[in-house]
């Protein structure tokens, strides 16, 4: 739920605007807002809307850590990750569809449902791996451009790494 606290939202907008100026995305406007949710998360939406969960806000230990997360999310918007994810998902769907057709064909030719199921499992795995690889690439790209924005806006660039380290400790070993 939207966190309807003008002071908090003004604070978020103030920090985010300092970073967004450095992104210089051809007039892209950004709107930063709080979300009443205890989980440690932030997200970017089409149109430059960036939500920051209250759980994340309260876990940052300084302004640069919060700014680091915001810079990362701005990076997702500026790099058009949402649009690119849509295109990538369509590619994964085509891979899965090709696998389904291949599975039917293999099953029909061999007369073995197991062979068809094997082809289907391989194609689903390939489609999932495409998505994972794309997501990792996007996260690294958002980090890379975000750290540049963070530094240019006058925040301590170590804030981004510091908060990611905090998140790692809170989540525990994987």
PLM regions with names:
Residues 120-122, 138-141:
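Active-site-adjacent, His/Asp/Glu-enriched structural segments that form or flank metal-binding
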Residues 106-126:
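A structural motif
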Residues 1-109, 127-134, 141-174:
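Peri-catalytic and regulatory segments of divalent metal-dependent proteins
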